[in-house]
Amino acid sequence: VIVLDCSPARDSNSANVGEGQLGRGLLLRYHDRSMLSFPELIAYQEEMAKKAKVKTQYFSSPGGTDAGAFHKSGEGVLTLTHCICARNLHTCSTILDVEDYLAAKKTLITLLNDFDQTRLNKLKGVRR
């Protein structure tokens, strides 16, 4: 399952440091309160971003996404959160960087074109 989502930017203070900055590309969301991402799936996402020639940034969140519910369903489901960050989430004035959006879109298309049964079997076989 690939969950498309938006995470809160953490670049609104004067220090402009930390994970989740506008203009820094696709978020490689490796942890949140609802799931621990599958390391090999994050590595694959990063590989596809490099292939698509887009910027990425690692991201951990105290919040969660719908990915958590998928991740824990049944016997567990390989789940990837494909995100960008934005300011003022859940308001009528959310701000995002269009280049981040385009980076996420380009990476997703690259990943979907590359993904096949062989890749799925390889990912599923890693933890057995």
Walk through the language-model features, giving the residues of each.
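Acidic/histidine-rich catalytic neighborhood of metal-dependent amide-processing enzymes
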Residues: V1-L27, R119-L123
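Active-site-adjacent substrate-binding region
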Residues: R24-K105, L111-R128
